[in-house]
Amino acid sequence: NVPRSWIYAFDNATSLMQNWDKAMDGVSELLGYPLIRNRKVLYMQVDVPNQRGVYGIGYPQMNNLYNPNNHALPEHAQANGNNNRWFLRDPTGWAVEFHELGHAQHMSRFGPEIEAIVNFPYVYIRNIKFGDDFDTAFQKSMGGQDNFTVDNTAVNWMVTVNFRNGNPMDSSHTTLDEFRYQHRGYAKYADIARLFGWQAVKKFFKQENLDHNANKPTCFNENCLFSYSDGLDPIDSRILRLSKAAGTDLTPLIHFWGIHPDNSTALAQAITAAGLSSSTIIRDKLIY
């Protein structure tokens, strides 16, 4: 919802709303949700105070603040029916809004990815729905950090002490954390998409939702204390489920990106039992 004074002179309202529909459909397509839901995918409000002091989720999401009583704001000078706020020009113009929307989508994840994977739907939206090349879409997905292609992100991870010592990525929620608010925290999914196609990622999330709706355990947080039907620990089970969606063993790729199996032997046996083989595509990418 926006003030009438911002939009009464718009001459492109139809194309604007069509682009909003494309962006929201992209979120649903990637994550395996129906395009028509019982609520809007994203409901934004500009004239409700944000009591948190930080950006966040909500229905409505209130991350674009406007105080109608503060006449020093540029919005008052632009109250000519043709305001230039990003959401009135380009629905994908602010990646932060999609980061917060990602939290609201309740997508499954590896525990440490809580502030990382939520950026990934933006990559699909810009690449598939709006035609950006893959690297450009990935670069834009973390807002101002536009110099990180997937390959540059790999270098950004490989130069760390943890990578050189063969350790998992740091997930300490300190200044040393290597997942949150960083491309390298979700680049594994970009690699899966560019190596095996977007369909592999979409198939995974679709199955996650089907399993969740059927009361089969899936990991939606870092405290996965239930047992899995495959008998694996949470990390290993998710690696197996991702591998099934891609049709190949993703363990080496996910290991490269700092998520290590809990029980390598049990995971390898489950991978073999699922009829999944090693991938020369992954091998070639890792030794490239």
State where each predicted segment sits.
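Active-site neighborhood of glycoside hydrolase catalytic domains
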Residues: 124-125, 154-245, 249
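Beta/coil-rich, acidic/histidine-enriched accessory regions frequently appended to metallopeptidases
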Residues: 224-288
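Residues that form generic nucleotide/phosphate-binding pockets
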Residues: 19, 23-26, 30, 207, ...
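Short, solvent-exposed positions on alpha-helices
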Residues: 112, 116, 199-203, 252
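Short alpha-helical "patches" and their helix-cap loops
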Residues: 133-145, 199-214, 256
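A short hydrophobic/aromatic micro-motif that marks alpha-helical segments and, especially, helix-coil
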Residues: 129, 212, 262-264
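Amphipathic alpha-helical surface "interface" segments used
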Residues: 44-50, 209-211, 276-278
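Catalytic cores of extracellular degradative/oxidative enzymes
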Residues: 1-194
